[in-house]
Protein backbone atom coordinates (compact mmCIF):
# COMPACT_ATOMS: atom_id res chain seq x y z
CA UNK A 1 0.00 0.00 0.00
CA UNK A 2 1.44 3.36 -1.05
CA UNK A 3 2.00 5.71 1.91
CA UNK A 4 4.23 8.73 2.58
CA UNK A 5 6.61 9.09 5.54
CA UNK A 6 7.41 6.74 8.36
CA UNK A 7 4.15 5.43 9.69
CA UNK A 8 2.33 8.35 8.03
CA UNK A 9 -1.29 8.03 6.97
CA UNK A 10 -0.94 10.21 3.83
CA UNK A 11 -1.78 8.06 0.80
CA UNK A 12 -0.35 8.53 -2.68
CA UNK A 13 -1.17 7.45 -6.23
CA UNK A 14 0.52 4.16 -7.16
CA UNK A 15 1.00 5.41 -10.77
CA UNK A 16 2.21 9.03 -10.62
CA UNK A 17 3.25 9.14 -6.94
CA UNK A 18 1.25 12.29 -6.11
CA UNK A 19 -0.11 12.49 -2.57
CA UNK A 20 -3.82 12.73 -1.79
CA UNK A 21 -3.31 16.43 -0.98
CA UNK A 22 -1.96 17.09 -4.48
CA UNK A 23 -4.95 15.59 -6.32
CA UNK A 24 -8.73 16.04 -6.19
CA UNK A 25 -9.61 12.37 -5.75
CA UNK A 26 -7.76 9.18 -4.84
CA UNK A 27 -9.54 5.90 -5.57
CA UNK A 28 -8.52 2.77 -3.65
CA UNK A 29 -8.23 -0.76 -4.99
CA UNK A 30 -6.82 -3.97 -3.45
CA UNK A 31 -3.41 -2.69 -2.29
CA UNK A 32 -3.31 0.06 -4.92
CA UNK A 33 -4.44 3.70 -5.39
CA UNK A 34 -5.12 5.77 -8.51
CA UNK A 35 -5.72 9.53 -8.69
CA UNK A 36 -8.27 11.40 -10.86
CA UNK A 37 -5.48 12.81 -13.08
CA UNK A 38 -4.22 9.32 -13.96
CA UNK A 39 -7.82 8.19 -14.64
CA UNK A 40 -8.27 11.12 -17.08
CA UNK A 41 -4.99 10.23 -18.77
CA UNK A 42 -6.06 6.58 -19.11
CA UNK A 43 -9.38 7.67 -20.63
CA UNK A 44 -7.56 9.83 -23.19
CA UNK A 45 -5.28 6.92 -24.17
CA UNK A 46 -8.25 4.55 -24.55
CA UNK A 47 -10.26 7.09 -26.61
CA UNK A 48 -7.27 7.69 -28.88
CA UNK A 49 -6.75 3.97 -29.46
CA UNK A 50 -10.47 3.39 -30.07
CA UNK A 51 -10.69 6.26 -32.58
CA UNK A 52 -7.66 4.90 -34.45
CA UNK A 53 -9.33 1.50 -34.72
CA UNK A 54 -12.80 2.89 -35.41
CA UNK A 55 -12.47 3.05 -39.18
CA UNK A 56 -15.24 1.12 -40.91
CA UNK A 57 -13.93 -2.08 -42.45
CA UNK A 58 -14.96 -3.00 -45.99
CA UNK A 59 -17.19 -5.76 -44.60
CA UNK A 60 -19.08 -3.26 -42.42
CA UNK A 61 -19.59 -0.70 -45.20
CA UNK A 62 -23.35 -0.54 -45.91
CA UNK A 63 -24.35 -1.74 -49.36
CA UNK A 64 -26.14 0.64 -51.79
CA UNK A 65 -29.54 -0.92 -51.00
CA UNK A 66 -28.97 -0.43 -47.25
CA UNK A 67 -27.93 3.19 -47.81
CA UNK A 68 -31.04 3.73 -49.97
CA UNK A 69 -33.32 2.22 -47.28
CA UNK A 70 -31.72 4.42 -44.61
CA UNK A 71 -32.30 7.52 -46.75
CA UNK A 72 -35.91 6.40 -47.24
CA UNK A 73 -36.43 6.56 -43.46
CA UNK A 74 -35.59 10.26 -43.42
CA UNK A 75 -36.05 11.67 -46.95
CA UNK A 76 -39.36 11.60 -48.84
CA UNK A 77 -39.37 11.21 -52.63
CA UNK A 78 -36.32 11.89 -54.84
CA UNK A 79 -35.94 8.15 -55.56
CA UNK A 80 -33.50 8.55 -58.46
CA UNK A 81 -31.29 10.99 -56.53
CA UNK A 82 -31.22 8.67 -53.49
CA UNK A 83 -30.26 5.71 -55.67
CA UNK A 84 -27.49 7.70 -57.41
CA UNK A 85 -26.12 8.97 -54.10
CA UNK A 86 -26.26 5.49 -52.51
CA UNK A 87 -24.16 4.00 -55.33
CA UNK A 88 -21.72 6.94 -55.42
CA UNK A 89 -21.17 6.94 -51.65
CA UNK A 90 -20.72 3.15 -51.54
CA UNK A 91 -18.15 3.23 -54.35
CA UNK A 92 -16.32 6.18 -52.79
CA UNK A 93 -15.91 4.61 -49.35
CA UNK A 94 -15.17 1.19 -50.87
CA UNK A 95 -12.31 2.90 -52.69
CA UNK A 96 -11.19 4.57 -49.44
CA UNK A 97 -11.31 1.36 -47.39
CA UNK A 98 -9.52 -0.68 -50.04
CA UNK A 99 -6.82 1.98 -50.31
CA UNK A 100 -7.37 2.32 -54.05
CA UNK A 101 -5.79 5.72 -54.29
CA UNK A 102 -3.64 6.59 -57.27
CA UNK A 103 -0.12 5.15 -57.11
CA UNK A 104 -0.87 2.70 -54.27
CA UNK A 105 2.31 1.15 -52.89
CA UNK A 106 0.81 -2.37 -52.98
CA UNK A 107 1.55 -2.83 -56.69
CA UNK A 108 4.23 -1.90 -59.17
CA UNK A 109 3.75 1.25 -61.25
CA UNK A 110 2.55 -0.85 -64.22
CA UNK A 111 0.01 -2.87 -62.19
CA UNK A 112 -1.59 -0.07 -60.15
CA UNK A 113 -5.27 0.64 -60.88
CA UNK A 114 -6.15 4.27 -60.34
CA UNK A 115 -9.68 4.59 -59.01
CA UNK A 116 -10.67 8.23 -59.38
CA UNK A 117 -12.89 9.99 -56.87
CA UNK A 118 -16.55 10.44 -57.90
CA UNK A 119 -17.76 13.72 -56.46
CA UNK A 120 -21.44 14.49 -56.92
CA UNK A 121 -23.39 17.42 -58.38
CA UNK A 122 -27.02 17.66 -57.21
CA UNK A 123 -29.32 19.90 -59.26
CA UNK A 124 -32.79 21.02 -58.22
CA UNK A 125 -34.97 23.78 -56.75
CA UNK A 126 -34.44 25.12 -53.25
CA UNK A 127 -36.12 23.28 -50.36
CA UNK A 128 -36.16 19.88 -52.07
CA UNK A 129 -33.71 18.06 -49.81
CA UNK A 130 -30.29 18.48 -51.46
CA UNK A 131 -28.53 19.47 -48.23
CA UNK A 132 -30.57 17.06 -46.12
CA UNK A 133 -29.60 14.10 -48.34
CA UNK A 134 -25.89 14.82 -47.79
CA UNK A 135 -26.42 15.37 -44.03
CA UNK A 136 -28.29 12.07 -43.69
CA UNK A 137 -25.55 10.18 -45.54
CA UNK A 138 -22.89 11.60 -43.22
CA UNK A 139 -24.95 10.62 -40.16
CA UNK A 140 -25.39 7.06 -41.41
CA UNK A 141 -21.68 6.60 -42.13
CA UNK A 142 -20.65 8.40 -38.92
CA UNK A 143 -18.22 10.66 -40.76
CA UNK A 144 -17.59 14.40 -40.20
CA UNK A 145 -19.83 16.68 -42.26
CA UNK A 146 -19.55 20.35 -43.18
CA UNK A 147 -21.73 22.73 -45.19
CA UNK A 148 -20.32 25.69 -47.12
CA UNK A 149 -22.04 28.44 -49.08
CA UNK A 150 -20.35 29.06 -52.42
CA UNK A 151 -21.64 32.65 -52.54
CA UNK A 152 -19.41 33.61 -49.58
CA UNK A 153 -16.24 32.38 -51.33
CA UNK A 154 -13.73 34.41 -53.32
CA UNK A 155 -10.41 33.38 -54.80
CA UNK A 156 -7.27 33.97 -52.73
CA UNK A 157 -6.19 37.59 -52.40
CA UNK A 158 -9.67 39.14 -52.46
CA UNK A 159 -12.10 40.12 -49.71
CA UNK A 160 -14.22 37.12 -48.71
CA UNK A 161 -13.71 33.55 -47.57
CA UNK A 162 -10.90 31.42 -48.97
CA UNK A 163 -11.84 27.94 -50.18
CA UNK A 164 -9.55 26.54 -47.45
CA UNK A 165 -12.11 27.74 -44.89
CA UNK A 166 -14.41 24.96 -46.15
CA UNK A 167 -11.80 22.44 -45.02
CA UNK A 168 -11.47 24.22 -41.67
CA UNK A 169 -15.21 23.69 -41.06
CA UNK A 170 -14.74 19.96 -41.70
CA UNK A 171 -11.73 19.80 -39.36
CA UNK A 172 -13.78 21.56 -36.68
CA UNK A 173 -16.64 19.08 -37.22
CA UNK A 174 -14.10 16.29 -36.61
CA UNK A 175 -12.95 17.96 -33.34
CA UNK A 176 -9.64 18.84 -35.02
CA UNK A 177 -8.92 15.16 -35.74
CA UNK A 178 -7.35 15.64 -39.19
CA UNK A 179 -7.22 11.91 -39.97
CA UNK A 180 -10.96 11.63 -39.32
CA UNK A 181 -11.69 14.79 -41.33
CA UNK A 182 -9.83 13.29 -44.31
CA UNK A 183 -12.69 10.79 -44.81
CA UNK A 184 -15.53 13.28 -44.27
CA UNK A 185 -18.21 14.74 -46.54
CA UNK A 186 -18.41 18.40 -47.60
CA UNK A 187 -21.58 19.88 -49.08
CA UNK A 188 -21.10 23.08 -51.09
CA UNK A 189 -24.42 24.84 -51.65
CA UNK A 190 -25.41 27.51 -54.19
CA UNK A 191 -22.69 26.44 -56.63
CA UNK A 192 -24.80 27.84 -59.49
CA UNK A 193 -24.21 31.33 -58.06
CA UNK A 194 -20.48 31.09 -58.90
CA UNK A 195 -21.17 30.34 -62.55
CA UNK A 196 -19.19 32.41 -65.03
CA UNK A 197 -21.08 35.58 -65.95
CA UNK A 198 -20.79 34.77 -69.65
CA UNK A 199 -20.02 31.64 -71.64
CA UNK A 200 -16.90 33.19 -73.17
CA UNK A 201 -13.93 33.83 -70.84
CA UNK A 202 -14.01 37.38 -69.53
CA UNK A 203 -11.13 39.85 -69.81
CA UNK A 204 -11.97 41.26 -66.36
CA UNK A 205 -11.35 39.23 -63.21
CA UNK A 206 -14.42 37.30 -62.01
CA UNK A 207 -13.28 36.75 -58.40
CA UNK A 208 -16.56 35.34 -57.08
CA UNK A 209 -17.42 33.29 -60.16
CA UNK A 210 -14.85 31.58 -62.35
CA UNK A 211 -12.13 32.47 -59.82
CA UNK A 212 -13.89 30.44 -57.11
CA UNK A 213 -14.34 27.49 -59.46
CA UNK A 214 -10.61 27.57 -60.24
CA UNK A 215 -9.80 27.74 -56.51
CA UNK A 216 -12.08 24.77 -55.76
CA UNK A 217 -10.57 22.55 -58.47
CA UNK A 218 -7.56 21.28 -56.53
CA UNK A 219 -9.27 20.55 -53.21
CA UNK A 220 -12.17 18.76 -54.92
CA UNK A 221 -9.85 16.64 -57.05
CA UNK A 222 -7.49 15.77 -54.20
CA UNK A 223 -4.50 17.65 -52.83
CA UNK A 224 -2.66 18.37 -49.60
CA UNK A 225 -4.04 21.73 -48.52
CA UNK A 226 -2.69 24.14 -45.92
CA UNK A 227 -5.56 25.27 -43.71
CA UNK A 228 -5.26 28.24 -41.32
CA UNK A 229 -6.57 27.00 -37.93
CA UNK A 230 -8.10 30.41 -37.14
CA UNK A 231 -9.52 30.92 -40.62
CA UNK A 232 -8.95 33.69 -43.12
CA UNK A 233 -5.78 35.69 -43.63
CA UNK A 234 -5.95 37.81 -40.46
CA UNK A 235 -3.24 35.84 -38.66
CA UNK A 236 -0.25 35.59 -41.04
CA UNK A 237 2.05 33.93 -38.50
CA UNK A 238 -0.28 31.08 -37.51
CA UNK A 239 0.80 27.49 -38.13
CA UNK A 240 -1.15 25.78 -40.89
CA UNK A 241 -2.95 22.43 -40.63
CA UNK A 242 -2.06 20.03 -43.45
CA UNK A 243 -5.02 17.98 -44.73
CA UNK A 244 -5.17 15.54 -47.65
CA UNK A 245 -8.46 15.95 -49.56
CA UNK A 246 -8.04 12.81 -51.70
CA UNK A 247 -10.63 10.85 -49.71
CA UNK A 248 -13.02 13.69 -48.85
CA UNK A 249 -16.31 13.31 -50.71
CA UNK A 250 -17.62 16.57 -52.15
CA UNK A 251 -21.35 16.93 -52.81
CA UNK A 252 -22.06 20.13 -54.71
CA UNK A 253 -25.59 21.49 -55.06
CA UNK A 254 -27.48 24.31 -56.72
CA UNK A 255 -30.88 25.34 -58.07
CA UNK A 256 -29.52 26.19 -61.57
CA UNK A 257 -32.54 28.34 -62.47
CA UNK A 258 -32.80 28.60 -66.26
CA UNK A 259 -30.72 25.49 -66.97
CA UNK A 260 -33.83 23.76 -68.35
CA UNK A 261 -33.95 26.32 -71.20
CA UNK A 262 -30.37 25.47 -72.18
CA UNK A 263 -31.21 21.74 -72.19
CA UNK A 264 -34.40 22.53 -74.12
CA UNK A 265 -32.41 24.24 -76.88
CA UNK A 266 -30.16 21.19 -77.15
CA UNK A 267 -32.93 18.58 -77.28
CA UNK A 268 -35.11 20.79 -79.51
CA UNK A 269 -38.16 20.78 -77.25
CA UNK A 270 -40.62 23.68 -77.34
CA UNK A 271 -41.83 25.37 -74.15
CA UNK A 272 -45.50 25.35 -73.31
CA UNK A 273 -45.81 28.94 -72.11
CA UNK A 274 -46.86 30.18 -68.70
CA UNK A 275 -50.65 30.44 -68.59
CA UNK A 276 -52.29 29.23 -65.38
CA UNK A 277 -53.66 26.11 -67.11
CA UNK A 278 -50.34 24.82 -68.40
CA UNK A 279 -47.94 26.04 -65.68
CA UNK A 280 -48.08 22.74 -63.76
CA UNK A 281 -47.35 20.78 -66.91
CA UNK A 282 -44.52 23.18 -67.80
CA UNK A 283 -42.94 22.64 -64.36
CA UNK A 284 -43.11 18.86 -64.82
CA UNK A 285 -41.48 19.18 -68.24
CA UNK A 286 -38.74 21.37 -66.73
CA UNK A 287 -38.02 18.63 -64.17
CA UNK A 288 -37.87 16.03 -66.95
CA UNK A 289 -35.41 18.23 -68.80
CA UNK A 290 -33.15 18.61 -65.74
CA UNK A 291 -32.91 14.82 -65.59
CA UNK A 292 -31.37 14.95 -69.11
CA UNK A 293 -28.60 17.41 -68.19
CA UNK A 294 -25.20 16.92 -69.82
CA UNK A 295 -21.79 18.50 -69.11
CA UNK A 296 -22.08 20.79 -72.16
CA UNK A 297 -25.31 22.27 -70.74
CA UNK A 298 -23.51 23.12 -67.50
CA UNK A 299 -20.68 24.72 -69.50
CA UNK A 300 -23.21 26.95 -71.27
CA UNK A 301 -24.71 27.81 -67.88
CA UNK A 302 -21.32 29.07 -66.71
CA UNK A 303 -19.40 26.25 -65.03
CA UNK A 304 -15.90 25.80 -66.42
CA UNK A 305 -15.18 22.42 -68.10
CA UNK A 306 -12.38 21.57 -65.63
CA UNK A 307 -14.77 22.03 -62.70
CA UNK A 308 -17.50 19.90 -64.32
CA UNK A 309 -14.87 17.21 -64.94
CA UNK A 310 -14.32 16.90 -61.17
CA UNK A 311 -18.06 16.19 -60.69
CA UNK A 312 -18.64 13.08 -62.81
CA UNK A 313 -21.90 12.09 -61.13
CA UNK A 314 -24.93 14.33 -61.67
CA UNK A 315 -28.21 13.74 -59.80
CA UNK A 316 -31.35 15.87 -60.07
CA UNK A 317 -34.04 16.42 -57.44
CA UNK A 318 -37.57 17.43 -58.38
CA UNK A 319 -39.84 20.10 -56.94
CA UNK A 320 -42.00 18.80 -54.09
CA UNK A 321 -45.79 18.77 -54.55
CA UNK A 322 -48.44 18.95 -51.82
CA UNK A 323 -48.54 15.17 -51.34
CA UNK A 324 -44.76 15.00 -50.84
CA UNK A 325 -44.83 17.90 -48.35
CA UNK A 326 -47.62 16.20 -46.36
CA UNK A 327 -45.48 13.03 -46.25
CA UNK A 328 -42.45 15.06 -45.10
CA UNK A 329 -44.54 16.52 -42.28
CA UNK A 330 -45.78 13.16 -41.00
CA UNK A 331 -43.89 10.10 -42.25
CA UNK A 332 -40.10 10.28 -41.69
CA UNK A 333 -38.60 9.05 -38.44
CA UNK A 334 -37.94 12.64 -37.35
CA UNK A 335 -40.93 14.24 -39.13
CA UNK A 336 -41.69 17.84 -38.10
CA UNK A 337 -45.14 17.00 -36.70
CA UNK A 338 -43.56 14.28 -34.51
CA UNK A 339 -40.90 16.74 -33.33
CA UNK A 340 -43.46 19.32 -32.17
CA UNK A 341 -45.64 16.63 -30.60
CA UNK A 342 -42.57 15.56 -28.61
CA UNK A 343 -41.93 19.16 -27.49
CA UNK A 344 -45.51 19.48 -26.20
CA UNK A 345 -45.32 16.03 -24.61
CA UNK A 346 -42.40 17.25 -22.48
CA UNK A 347 -44.86 19.76 -20.97
CA UNK A 348 -47.43 16.99 -20.45
CA UNK A 349 -49.63 18.24 -23.31
CA UNK A 350 -50.89 16.31 -26.34
CA UNK A 351 -50.60 18.11 -29.70
CA UNK A 352 -52.87 17.11 -32.57
CA UNK A 353 -52.84 18.35 -36.16
CA UNK A 354 -56.00 17.53 -38.13
CA UNK A 355 -55.37 16.10 -41.65
CA UNK A 356 -56.67 19.30 -43.29
CA UNK A 357 -54.32 21.38 -41.09
CA UNK A 358 -51.33 19.41 -42.36
CA UNK A 359 -52.53 19.92 -45.95
CA UNK A 360 -52.91 23.65 -45.25
CA UNK A 361 -49.30 23.85 -43.98
CA UNK A 362 -48.14 22.11 -47.19
CA UNK A 363 -50.23 24.50 -49.34
CA UNK A 364 -48.77 27.47 -47.49
CA UNK A 365 -45.21 26.25 -48.19
CA UNK A 366 -46.07 25.82 -51.89
CA UNK A 367 -47.45 29.37 -52.06
CA UNK A 368 -44.29 30.77 -50.48
CA UNK A 369 -42.11 28.72 -52.83
CA UNK A 370 -39.88 27.61 -49.95
CA UNK A 371 -40.41 23.86 -50.35
CA UNK A 372 -39.66 21.63 -47.36
CA UNK A 373 -37.30 24.26 -45.93
CA UNK A 374 -40.21 26.58 -45.10
CA UNK A 375 -42.35 24.01 -43.25
CA UNK A 376 -40.75 24.58 -39.85
CA UNK A 377 -41.17 28.37 -40.11
CA UNK A 378 -44.89 27.95 -40.87
CA UNK A 379 -45.43 25.60 -37.90
CA UNK A 380 -43.52 28.01 -35.64
CA UNK A 381 -45.82 30.85 -36.72
CA UNK A 382 -48.94 28.72 -36.16
CA UNK A 383 -47.88 27.51 -32.70
CA UNK A 384 -46.10 30.63 -31.41
CA UNK A 385 -48.83 31.89 -29.05
CA UNK A 386 -49.67 28.38 -27.81
CA UNK A 387 -46.01 27.59 -27.12
CA UNK A 388 -45.81 30.88 -25.21
CA UNK A 389 -48.92 30.32 -23.04
CA UNK A 390 -49.23 26.56 -22.46
CA UNK A 391 -46.02 25.95 -20.42
CA UNK A 392 -47.29 28.45 -17.79
CA UNK A 393 -50.65 26.72 -17.51
CA UNK A 394 -51.11 23.37 -15.83
CA UNK A 395 -54.75 22.92 -16.86
CA UNK A 396 -54.26 22.15 -20.58
CA UNK A 397 -54.34 18.49 -21.66
CA UNK A 398 -54.53 18.81 -25.43
CA UNK A 399 -54.00 21.33 -28.25
CA UNK A 400 -55.79 20.81 -31.58
CA UNK A 401 -54.63 22.60 -34.75
CA UNK A 402 -57.15 22.81 -37.62
CA UNK A 403 -57.03 24.23 -41.16
CA UNK A 404 -58.58 27.50 -39.93
CA UNK A 405 -55.71 27.94 -37.46
CA UNK A 406 -53.18 27.69 -40.29
CA UNK A 407 -54.98 29.68 -42.99
CA UNK A 408 -57.01 32.26 -41.03
CA UNK A 409 -54.96 32.77 -37.87
CA UNK A 410 -57.70 31.38 -35.59
CA UNK A 411 -56.45 30.28 -32.15
CA UNK A 412 -55.92 26.50 -31.71
CA UNK A 413 -58.47 24.57 -29.64
CA UNK A 414 -57.29 24.08 -26.04
CA UNK A 415 -58.83 21.15 -24.15
CA UNK A 416 -58.64 21.37 -20.32
CA UNK A 417 -57.49 18.37 -18.29
CA UNK A 418 -60.91 17.93 -16.63
CA UNK A 419 -62.68 17.61 -20.00
CA UNK A 420 -60.11 15.05 -21.14
CA UNK A 421 -60.57 13.02 -17.92
CA UNK A 422 -64.37 13.00 -18.33
CA UNK A 423 -64.04 11.89 -21.97
CA UNK A 424 -61.76 8.97 -20.99
CA UNK A 425 -63.98 7.87 -18.08
CA UNK A 426 -67.16 8.02 -20.19
From Swiss-Prot:
User: Which Pfam families does the record cross-reference, listed alphabetically?
Assistant: AAA_2, ClpB_D2-small, zf-C4_ClpX
Database matches in CDD domains? RecA-like_ClpX
- List of residues binding Zn(2+): 13, 16, 35, 38
Q: Which UniProt keywords apply?
A: ATP-binding, Chaperone, Metal-binding, Nucleotide-binding, Zinc
ClpX-type ZB domain boundaries: 1-54
Q: InterPro entries of this UniProt entry?
A: AAA+_ATPase, ATP-dep_Clp_protease_ClpX, ATPase_AAA_core, Clp_ATPase_C, Clp_protease_ATP-bd_su_ClpX, ClpX_bact, P-loop_NTPase, Znf_CppX_C4
Q: Tell me one GO molecular function of this protein.
A: ATP hydrolysis activity
Q: Where does ATP bind?
A: 125-132
Tell me the HAMAP family matching this sequence. ClpX
Q: Which family does it belong to?
A: Belongs to the ClpX chaperone family.
- Record's protein name: ATP-dependent Clp protease ATP-binding subunit ClpX
Q: List the taxonomic lineage.
A: Bacteria, Bacillati, Actinomycetota, Actinomycetes, Propionibacteriales
Q: Which gene encodes it?
A: clpX
Amino acid sequence: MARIGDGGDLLKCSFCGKSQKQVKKLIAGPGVYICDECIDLCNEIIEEELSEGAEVSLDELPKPKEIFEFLNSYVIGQEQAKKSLAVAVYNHYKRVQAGLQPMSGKHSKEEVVEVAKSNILVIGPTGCGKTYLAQTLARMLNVPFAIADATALTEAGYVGEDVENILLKLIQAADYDVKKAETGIIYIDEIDKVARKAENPSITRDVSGEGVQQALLKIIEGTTASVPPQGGRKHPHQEFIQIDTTNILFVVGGAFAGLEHIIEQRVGKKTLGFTAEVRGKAEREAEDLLAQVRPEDLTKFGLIPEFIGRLPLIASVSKLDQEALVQILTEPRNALVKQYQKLFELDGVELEFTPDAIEAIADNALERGTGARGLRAIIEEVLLHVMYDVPSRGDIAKVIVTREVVMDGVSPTLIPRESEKKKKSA
